[in-house]
């Protein structure tokens, strides 16, 4: 029986990895062994950074809410505590959208429910 050295299976696997790393710099996009390491690392980073993005967005929303709240001489923590006590079910994302896109209604929300 003739010997088959992986045939097209290995070529397909290598091509897939090289396609994944096609935008990378230098040998990282041309040589399979290096490209394979970089592809694994890139996929790991993308997995980690999806969780980081959630953290970063939450802190951005908090910064935006705090900025507009402090213009009204109210601290962020007091604002959130008061909204919870009044049972206003707006999460931080919604509050940040209001603060950025519809500032007058956000200020009205603060003034009517906190005073």
Swiss-Prot record:
**Which NCBIfam families is this protein grouped with?**
rplT_bact
Q: Do the record's keywords include rRNA-binding?
A: yes
GO CC annotation: chloroplast; ribonucleoprotein complex; ribosome
- Extract the PROSITE patterns matched here: RIBOSOMAL_L20
* Molecular function (Gene Ontology), one example: structural constituent of ribosome
Could you identify this protein by its name? Large ribosomal subunit protein bL20c
User: Which superkingdom does the taxonomy of this entry point to?
Assistant: Eukaryota
Q: Which family does it belong to?
A: Belongs to the bacterial ribosomal protein bL20 family.
Q: Which CDD domains match?
A: Ribosomal_L20
Q: Which UniProt keywords apply?
A: Chloroplast, Plastid, Ribonucleoprotein, Ribosomal protein, RNA-binding, rRNA-binding
UniProt subcellular location: Plastid, Chloroplast
Provide a GO biological process annotation.
translation
Task: Describe the task this protein carries out.
Answer: Binds directly to 23S ribosomal RNA and is necessary for the in vitro assembly process of the 50S ribosomal subunit. It is not involved in the protein synthesizing functions of that subunit.
């Amino acid at each position: 029986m003739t010997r088959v050295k992986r045939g097209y299976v290995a070529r397909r696997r290598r091509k897939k990895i090289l396609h994944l790393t096609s935008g990378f710099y230098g040998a990282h996009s041309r040589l399979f062994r290096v490209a394979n390491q970089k592809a694994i690392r890139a996929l790991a980073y993308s997995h980690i950074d999806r969780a980081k993005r959630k953290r970063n967005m939450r802190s951005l929303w908090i910064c935006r809410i705090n900025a507009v709240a402090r213009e009204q001489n109210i601290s962020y923590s007091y604002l959130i505590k008061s909204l919870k006590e009044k049972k206003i079910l707006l999460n931080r994302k919604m509050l940040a959208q209001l603060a950025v896109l519809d500032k007058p209604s956000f200020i009205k929300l603060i003034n009517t429910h906190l005073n």
